[in-house]
Amino acid sequence: MVAFDANEILTPFCEGHREGAILFDCQRMRQVEYGLFVPAWWGERAHPISEGGRGSAWFVEASFGNAVLRQYRRGGMIAMLNRDRYFWCGGHRTRSVLEFRLMRELISRGLPVPTPLAACYVRHGVQYRAAILMERLEGVSSLAMCVRGNSKEIHWEQIGRMISRFHREGLDHADLNAHNILLDQAGQCWLIDFDRGALRIPATKWREHNLARLLRSLLKIRGERSVDAVYRDFERLCRAYDLAWGRGC
């Protein structure tokens, strides 16, 4: 359960045939409108993000700072029939609102997460579409980019300690992969993409599931690197994870 935050404002809107709402951080944004969640509204200030995802994210240049716009898209076979609509179960249960509030809770616990700025949903009868706007982290690269670039400066131990911190706080990340771990040149790490994530009582099963998913991701993007090399790096990560977990940090 994520606690109520007095700095959140929920603003309903009706624009033509569109009805929905925008949840935003009133300390970071003064005004909001539906156009903020439409790439075309930004014009030349929106730049598609090619890495990871499903062609559903853009860097945007805003008056309130550089940001990332992400629209929620389905994956797998179901995307062939339904690309971006989800069943309506109430505004507070939309994926954008849940992720926005989860990210704010993680930040309140001191975890390295980009700041969520606003979340939007648009209802279409018994279905809805959603999008989220968040702070852009500058000077970072994804772990996937570092691996593909054969970087010698990947701080595997730091990544392991970071994941341990999130797990210690009970975060079950639904898609822990190399695209969702960001690194800077100093070795600082961040975790992104908390769609379908949840706070749980720390348990071995889901923690191991998260780590196994990350390993599969690293094997998938290994390129010309040997499988043994991937496992050696992952073992470094896991040793640091286990040590941090044992110390309770």
Swiss-Prot record:
The active site is at D175. GO terms for molecular function: ATP binding; kinase activity; phosphotransferase activity, alcohol group as acceptor. It holds the Pfam family Kdo. GO terms for cellular component: plasma membrane. It catalyses: an alpha-Kdo-(2->6)-lipid IVA + ATP = a 4-O-phospho-alpha-Kdo-(2->6)-lipid IVA + ADP + H(+). InterPro entries: KDO_kinase, Kinase-like_dom_sf. Pathway: Bacterial outer membrane biogenesis; LPS core biosynthesis. Keywords: ATP-binding, Cell inner membrane, Cell membrane, Kinase, Lipopolysaccharide biosynthesis, Membrane, Nucleotide-binding, Transferase. Belongs to the protein kinase superfamily. KdkA/RfaP family. This is 3-deoxy-D-manno-octulosonic acid kinase. The gene is kdkA.
